[in-house]
């Protein structure tokens, strides 16, 4: 990097995703590094030359240093915070049809979704929405599964349900069904897809693997 592009400071911003109990906000889980100074969460200042273990907060003794370090942060936050939003997965794209969704991409308000086969194999009673972007309006086939299609495993549930773009569909699942199919008309635009698979006791988990296929354009 040339001299004109060189920075004398570094900003570290940690964002742990929906597993965090609070929504991302300025200063939380942040650190600004410059020379021997470390400003934590915009409040705690440490001098690594005299205090490498960062035990003594000297923010009150060094207000000018705190002010200087804080001046770097908000322009940085304003540039990156718009990107801390759910990404919508394309449906009905000419380059990716059908779209295969997995529970790893559920957007949970708190905690993490089932994201590995060890968790999914326990058929947890949890579900969440996929943020999706219907790129082509038309008739879609939505197939609910608890395992990838390649596993060729039947659904362990008696009833399935979907909700998308204000449309709700529900139907009985017959024994040995590999994938529960719904067909719905979808308009173009961003929306959410949520799925439920109910057992005989009424407990519901989501369809951890769901295929969405555009079958007829409108």
Where are these regions (language model features)?
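Active-site rim elements
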Residues: 17-19, 24, 28, 54-61, ...
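Long, internal low-complexity/basic segments
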Residues: 58-218
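Intrinsically disordered, low-complexity polar regions and short flexible loop motifs
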Residues: 51
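C-terminal cap/loop subdomain of S1 sulfatases and analogous C-terminal strand-loop tails that border
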Residues: 1-48, 79-83, 94, 108-109
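Generic recognition of well-ordered alpha-helical segments
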Residues: 34-35, 44-45, 54, 68, ...
């Amino acid at each position: 990097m040339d001299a004109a592009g060189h920075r004398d400071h570094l900003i570290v911003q940690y964002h742990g995703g929906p597993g965090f109990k609070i929504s991302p906000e300025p200063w939380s889980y942040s650190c600004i590094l410059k020379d021997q100074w470390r400003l934590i969460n915009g409040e705690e200042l440490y001098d690594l030359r005299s205090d490498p273990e960062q035990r003594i907060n000297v923010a009150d003794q060094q207000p000018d240093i705190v002010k200087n370090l804080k001046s770097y942060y908000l322009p940085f936050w304003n540039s990156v915070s718009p990107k801390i939003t759910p990404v919508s997965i394309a449906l009905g794209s000419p380059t990716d049809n059908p779209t295969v969704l997995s529970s790893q991409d559920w957007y949970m308000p708190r905690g993490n979704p089932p994201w590995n086969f060890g968790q999914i194999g326990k058929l947890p009673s949890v579900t969440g929405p996929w943020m999706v972007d219907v790129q082509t309006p038309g008739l879609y086939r939505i197939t609910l599964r608890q395992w990838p299609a390649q596993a060729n495993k039947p659904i362990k549930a008696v009833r399935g349900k979907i909700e998308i773009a204000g449309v709700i569909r529900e139907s009985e699942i017959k024994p040995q069904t590999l994938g529960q199919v719904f067909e719905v008309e979808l308009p173009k635009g961003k929306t959410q897809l949520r799925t439920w698979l109910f057992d005989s006791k009424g407990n519901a988990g989501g369809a951890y693997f769901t295929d969405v296929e555009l079958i007829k354009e409108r």
